């Protein structure tokens, strides 16, 4: 059989490792904004706005309400124009079953009566990011408050 002394084995291993690293640099996966889907960009952009303040009627990082937040995020991250109100946003897109939610979907709630009054962006693991009265926050959809008020979800980008 073919046998190398320990010094030559170490040198050979170092050369093979260097060649593999070199090739992985040239031929490895490409991680650019272009490679991200619109829904991934939407989620990433929404996370940058966490802790922005709440402002009734707000549509900018200086202050958002729920639908102003989703409208702003989708416009900036996915070049998608959404209607201004939560109720009107609920009329857009394709309905999605709760068990089929994907990051970037819009989730809708009735928080003050009989019509849709709150919208947020689903980010995965039963969580969403939305502009609540305490500002832009991550929330758990499994909390009783949200479970009782859930209306449905829409997919507006892929």
Model-derived regions: residue spans:
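...with weaker cross-activation on analogous glycine-rich loops/strands in unrelated enzymes
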Residues: 2, 80-137
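Bacterial N-terminal signal peptides that target proteins for export
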Residues: 3-16
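Bacterial N-terminal signal peptides
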Residues: 14-25
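Catalytic cysteine-centered active-site loop
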Residues: 32, 53-103
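Extracytoplasmic/secreted envelope proteins and their assembly/folding machinery
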Residues: 39-43, 47, 67-71, 101, ...
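Short, low-complexity, Pro/Ser/Thr/Gly-rich segments in the mature regions of secreted, periplasmic
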Residues: 145-158
């Amino acid at each position: 059989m073919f046998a190398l002394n320990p010094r030559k084995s170490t040198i050979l291993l170092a050369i093979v490792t260097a060649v593999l690293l070199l090739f992985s640099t040239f031929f490895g996966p490409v991680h650019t904004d272009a490679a991200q889907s619109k829904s991934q960009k939407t989620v990433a952009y929404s996370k940058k706005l966490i802790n922005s303040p709440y402002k009734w009627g707000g549509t900018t990082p200086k202050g958002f309400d729920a639908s102003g937040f989703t409208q702003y995020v989708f416009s900036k991250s996915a070049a998608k124009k959404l209607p201004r109100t939560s109720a009107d946003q609920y009329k857009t897109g394709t309905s999605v079953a709760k068990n089929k939610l994907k990051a970037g979907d819009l989730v809708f709630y009735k928080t003050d009566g009989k019509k849709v009054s709150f919208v947020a962006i689903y980010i995965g693991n039963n969580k969403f990011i939305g502009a609540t009265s305490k500002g832009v926050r991550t929330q758990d959809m499994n909390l009783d408050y949200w479970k009782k008020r859930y209306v449905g979800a829409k997919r507006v980008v892929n």
